[in-house]
Amino acid sequence: MSVWALFAFFSLFLSLSVRGSAEQCGRQAGDALCPGGLCCSSYGWCGTTVDYCGIGCQSQCDGGGGGDGGDDGCDGGDDGGGDGDDGYLSDIIPKSKFDALLKFRNDARCPAAGFYTYNAFISAAKEFPDFGNTGDDLMRKREIAAFLGQTSHETTGGWPDAPCGPYAWGYCYLKEINCQPYCDPSSNYQCVAGKQYCGRGPIQLSWNYNYGLCGDDLKLPLLQEPELVETDPVISFKTAIWFWMKPQSPKPSCHAVITGNWTPSAADLEAGRVPGYGVITNIINGGIECGQGGPNAANEDRIGFYKKYCDSLGTTYGSNLDCYQQRPFGYGLSGLKDTM
């Protein structure tokens, strides 16, 4: 056998061996993460080139640069401790990790500086036992990453060349700029004279019907005193987690979507609404951001926060991160408004 024939034989053997071996990461390998922070390709293999870290990458798509503590002061690890939260969610997101992910929330340039505390987050979360506590650790971390990703976009103070990048500036804002009444007179929850129901808190709760329904469920006078969402940090976080956990037909809850407990109907599938982070964007602001056929800045920002937080917490992204091809839930239904 010639040298070239031997070379061809061994090349074919190596190719078949690699193709025949088990995938290393992602959905092909039980949502496993690559060692050393390597990217997981769409096909379930670990590496650092654009083939692994580019389009379709499933996790750790910065190629190992995030979440492990860099010398630029932009990434922070956690110390593995409970940080005084009595163990609730501390195995998923201790205080040190919360502080690292929301690094600039207390910066003097942020209007919400000093408001969004870890203790307020934990106190509010305890009122919703399934929040961050459904499924295995990867799923639990994914839910926290998704919640913080969406709410960080809603409250971001970042800009493209901001210190540590745009995704270090979540939870910078507390109240919508140029607050408007946001009063729907057709709602069962009639507006109180002189009150404004503009976006407030992590999820930017908006409209009188959301304040009213949320207030009923939480047993708080939010319709009469919407300002509570911007003056009490525990209440503020409660409204955000309430919205996350609450299905409002025809929309499922964000919690059900991210934990894999939502099954799309035939109408959902026809509208392109399939399980994944993108449907959560549709739930929150689909009428403005979804169904445009291609990328938009708001979607990209939500996804950017989510990927950063998934990488830092050590979980995978899942599929269907955007809603570019999804029709909004309210499409063709008179009277149905976006909730944000």
Swiss-Prot record:
<feature type="disulfide bond">
    <location>
        <begin position="290"/>
        <end position="323"/>
    </location>
</feature>
<dbReference type="Pfam" id="PF00182">
    <property type="entry name" value="Glyco_hydro_19"/>
</dbReference>
<keyword id="KW-0326">Glycosidase</keyword>
<feature type="region of interest" description="Chitinase">
    <location>
        <begin position="86"/>
        <end position="340"/>
    </location>
</feature>
<feature type="disulfide bond">
    <location>
        <begin position="57"/>
        <end position="61"/>
    </location>
</feature>
<dbReference type="GO" id="GO:0008843">
    <property type="term" value="F:endochitinase activity"/>
</dbReference>
<dbReference type="InterPro" id="IPR018371">
    <property type="entry name" value="Chitin-binding_1_CS"/>
</dbReference>
<feature type="disulfide bond">
    <location>
        <begin position="183"/>
        <end position="191"/>
    </location>
</feature>
<keyword id="KW-0147">Chitin-binding</keyword>
<dbReference type="GO" id="GO:0050832">
    <property type="term" value="P:defense response to fungus"/>
</dbReference>
<dbReference type="InterPro" id="IPR016283">
    <property type="entry name" value="Glyco_hydro_19"/>
</dbReference>
<feature type="disulfide bond">
    <location>
        <begin position="110"/>
        <end position="172"/>
    </location>
</feature>
<keyword id="KW-0732">Signal</keyword>
<comment type="function">
    <text>Defense against chitin-containing fungal pathogens.</text>
</comment>
<feature type="domain" description="Chitin-binding type-1">
    <location>
        <begin position="23"/>
        <end position="63"/>
    </location>
</feature>
<feature type="disulfide bond">
    <location>
        <begin position="34"/>
        <end position="46"/>
    </location>
</feature>
<dbReference type="GO" id="GO:0006032">
    <property type="term" value="P:chitin catabolic process"/>
</dbReference>
<dbReference type="GO" id="GO:0016998">
    <property type="term" value="P:cell wall macromolecule catabolic process"/>
</dbReference>
<protein>
    <recommendedName>
        <fullName>Acidic endochitinase WIN6</fullName>
        <ecNumber>3.2.1.14</ecNumber>
    </recommendedName>
</protein>
<keyword id="KW-0146">Chitin degradation</keyword>
<keyword id="KW-0378">Hydrolase</keyword>
<dbReference type="GO" id="GO:0000272">
    <property type="term" value="P:polysaccharide catabolic process"/>
</dbReference>
<dbReference type="InterPro" id="IPR036861">
    <property type="entry name" value="Endochitinase-like_sf"/>
</dbReference>
<feature type="active site" description="Proton donor">
    <location>
        <position position="154"/>
    </location>
</feature>
<dbReference type="Pfam" id="PF00187">
    <property type="entry name" value="Chitin_bind_1"/>
</dbReference>
<comment type="similarity">
    <text>Belongs to the glycosyl hydrolase 19 family. Chitinase class I subfamily.</text>
</comment>
<dbReference type="InterPro" id="IPR023346">
    <property type="entry name" value="Lysozyme-like_dom_sf"/>
</dbReference>
<feature type="region of interest" description="Spacer">
    <location>
        <begin position="64"/>
        <end position="85"/>
    </location>
</feature>
<feature type="disulfide bond">
    <location>
        <begin position="25"/>
        <end position="40"/>
    </location>
</feature>
<dbReference type="GO" id="GO:0008061">
    <property type="term" value="F:chitin binding"/>
</dbReference>
<keyword id="KW-1015">Disulfide bond</keyword>
<dbReference type="InterPro" id="IPR001002">
    <property type="entry name" value="Chitin-bd_1"/>
</dbReference>
<keyword id="KW-0119">Carbohydrate metabolism</keyword>
<feature type="signal peptide">
    <location>
        <begin position="1"/>
        <end position="22"/>
    </location>
</feature>
<keyword id="KW-0624">Polysaccharide degradation</keyword>
<feature type="disulfide bond">
    <location>
        <begin position="39"/>
        <end position="53"/>
    </location>
</feature>
<dbReference type="InterPro" id="IPR000726">
    <property type="entry name" value="Glyco_hydro_19_cat"/>
</dbReference>
<keyword id="KW-0611">Plant defense</keyword>
